[in-house]
Amino acid sequence: MDTAFKRRWSFEYIGIDKHDDEVKSIIKIAGQTFDWNTIRKAINEKMSKLRVNEDKLLGPYFVSEQYFNLDENNDKANDNLVSVFKNKVLMYLFEDACKQKLQNMFEGCDYSRYSKVCDAFDEKGFEIFGKDFVTEYYEKV
C-alpha cells in the first residue's frame, strides 16, 4: 500500500484467511474434487515460497460468492466455477501476481502463453502448478 495513503487514512489489517470459514465451495476438475479454500491456500503457500508479496495472495472472496458450488453433482454450477477459475484466478496469476515467476508457478505445463496454461488446466487440472502440487501443497494445508 502506498505510504502517502497510509499517512492520510486509518486502516485495519485483515489477514488473508480471515472469514474463510464463511466461504464453502468445491470445484471438480480433471476427475478430482477440491475444496476452494484449501486450493487457494495451497496456491498462496506456493506463491509465498516464490516470495510473492502477501498483498498479491488470494483471499476467500477472490472469486465472487455467486459462483460458489456445494453440490458436486451440479455440473452447470461446477462448469461456471471452473470457467471463473480459469478466467479470473489463472489470468490473475499469469498476468499479475506471478508474472515474473511463471516458470516456477506453472512448472507443470507450458507457460509460454496464457491459452496454453488454460488448455493444460482443462487437461491436467491443478497439476499445472507442478506434478506434486496436490501432495506437496494441497494435502498439507
Segment roles from a protein language model:
Residues 1-141:
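C-terminal regulatory/interaction module of P-loop NTP-utilizing enzymes
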